[in-house]
Amino acid sequence: MTRIKPPALPENATIAVVAPATAPQTRSDLEQAVDYFESRGHEVRLGKNLRKVHGYLAGTDAERAEDLQWALSEPGIDMVHAYTGGYGTARLYKLIDWDAVGDPRIVCGYSDLTALHLALAKHANWVTFYGPNILRFTRRKDDYPLTSETEDWFHRAFKPQPLGRVFEDPENPYVLTVGSGAGEGPLVGGCLTLLASSIGTPYEFDAEGCVLMVEDLNTDPYLVDTAINHLILAGKLDGVKGFVFGTDVNLKDQTIPEEPQSNLSIEEMLDELIGPLGIPAIANVPVGHGKHMATMPLGAQVRVDGDAKTLEVLEAGVA
């Protein structure tokens, strides 16, 4: 089924900022991000519970759900932008009135926000955007600065023109061929941990006829192996048109615990698990956690070419 595209982002957009997962880290971070978008002529509206904290969450489930319901349903909102990822978005599934979701609007976020992308694909059939959370739009100099590549791709993603070929990571430009050939289809995917945990729930993803994109952060290689093998055994790579693995970000020591001489690189693991599937597949593409991030329209048509080592967005994600 063809996804519904939200309208392109207007010059003077109304942007709702919510935190379905982890709480804002500091007030200054939030203020810097708001200033960034206001300086570009946009109106930024904050969820009323945005600054609340409940353990590692941005408020209770009810408080986070209230903000998310408002952002998805309130008339006049052009874009819903997640503050950050973390944990807890999937806890809101049963608290949102999906029938009350309003007109299509841009929804952007990544990492734990994979859960929201899956829910909106199921209940609203929208094209949504796996892209930087609003926390990235600060002057922070940590692992996730706002690079020119990330910034340019982000703003182009919400215009009614195809994005074209995804840029190479300027600091690690090598893209690995895992499977040869080329394939096209709607883009499906997100954070590997969230995709794997969706299996067996009403929100599990369907990648048949699609290009599957996965990425993750701070994960032991053997756990990446486990998660990808789980997808394969669950049939989630049956009938896919292509496979994309993001950049390896902050991978932990590539050894099995208590067996320091045992190791298997991510490249070797992908060759062993994905290679035999005979599908076009590439790895080390900047589509998630990492210093440079390409905003990707989930549900839009893309093309992956294993021999050319490219991922190309063939159509605009907005109308």
Language-model-detected regions and their locations in the chain:
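ATP/NTP phosphate-donor binding region
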Residues: 1-76
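Conserved beta-alpha junction segments in alpha/beta enzyme cores
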Residues: 24-29, 182-216
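A short helix->loop->beta-strand "cap" motif at the edges of active sites that frequently abuts
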Residues: 76, 101-106, 124-126, 240-241, ...
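N-terminal glycine-rich "phosphate-gripper" loop used for MgATP/nucleotide binding
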Residues: 79-89, 110
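Short, acidic/small-residue loops that bind anionic groups at enzyme active sites
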Residues: 98-120, 127-134
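Conserved anion/nucleotide-ligand pocket segment
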Residues: 125-193
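Internal helical hairpin/lid segments
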Residues: 203-265
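ATP/nucleoside-binding phosphotransfer catalytic cores, i.e., glycine-rich phosphate-binding loops
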Residues: 245-319
